[in-house]
């Protein structure tokens, strides 16, 4: 089996993984005040948050290019590939997953699967990494898909946003609820539900209590089994490092890493947002 792995630029990937010849990353363009950017090409994460703060309206992200995906899939057979696996951002935040399902049976001599990851950002990047590890240890395509299904079902992220007004602009919270929330110092904890949709998990008074609750949730959720935990932030590195230290102090093991939200999730949640993602080691 020669396996090609696809993902999109919403995945948080290490420089080492990005250099692999059998990895194909589809760009997700972001439009900020009429200018189009692609993160990692002509836009860094830091620049994105700077531009978003100065923009007259929220940035808009597009779906990855189906034409580009088709072009690469068409070329795979002559490169000796026999299988292709696409791990893209959750169907709960993008229509791309639904829009490409017709392609699975369109390429003769190529076995293709596009599972719904129900997640994005750093956990999505770790899924990609896991697939390469399983392939390298000799797993066949069916076994990789089975392990991936287990991993997807036990992966999520819990999120605390810094600015409720940003959720209003994105249509995730009413203006009245945001005004009341700001007055009462309410910090809603959001999460990726089992449909891969970002929704409110619970509401907590004050950031300090919300941070403590985030840690409790992750500790409860990852109590059985081995997990990788990632602190993901929207241009808030100091807050993220502080939370990482809290997690280590609470005994969540040594495998707690840091990552940044890119433009896709950053647009939804705003600067200062912070999340705890978790994914099982299989």
Swiss-Prot record:
Record carries keyword Thylakoid: no
Keywords, ordered alphabetically: Lipid-binding
Keyword Cytoplasm (UniProt): no
Residues reported to bind hexadecanoate: 61, 94
Record InterPro entries: DegV, DegV_C, DegV_domain_contain
Domain DegV: 3-280
TM annotation in the entry: none
GO molecular function, a single term: lipid binding
Entries under Gene3D superfamilies matching the protein: 3.30.1180.10, 3.40.50.10170
Role summary: May bind long-chain fatty acids, such as palmitate, and may play a role in lipid transport or fatty acid metabolism.
NCBIfam families noted in UniProt: DegV
Name of the protein described by the UniProt record: DegV domain-containing protein SP_1557
